[in-house]
Amino acid sequence: MTLAAADRPLTLLVVDDHTLFRRGLIALLGQDAGLQVVGEAGDAAEALHLVPRLRPDVILLDNHLPGVMGVDAIRGLREVSPHSRVLMLTVSEDSQDLAAA
């Protein structure tokens, strides 16, 4: 199964509570014609609200969001958008965090 049809860009939702990082990542991704950032969220609740409407192919998700770990957020995101793939982002070197991801 492919994530996006060859005639359209891969759609992305970027979820990270650090605005500067999130905006920088969006700017970087925007340079690739094969990618289209369709939305951004600063926390899991906002992402859960956006995903059913935006239906992104891929969700780029920070592992450490306010009030919820990324692994827990993935469960909720899969419920509202089972077709979306989730790519977790983290700067953590904690082996338990990495194993859970």
Where are these regions (language model features)?
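Alpha4 helix (beta4-alpha4-beta5 surface) of REC/receiver domains from two-component response regulators
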Residues: 72, 93-101
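Acidic catalytic/metal-coordinating carboxylates
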Residues: 43-46, 69-72
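Conserved sequence signature across two-component system core domains
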Residues: 15-16, 41, 59
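Short hydrophobic/Thr-rich beta-strand motif most characteristic of the beta2 strand and flanking loop
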Residues: 34-42, 50
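Conserved active-site segment of CheY-like receiver
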Residues: 17, 89-93
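Conserved phosphotransfer cores of two-component systems
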Residues: 50-54, 76-84
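Active-site residues of response regulator receiver
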Residues: 62-63, 90
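Non-catalytic signal-transmission and effector/linker regions of two-component phosphorelay proteins
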Residues: 1-11
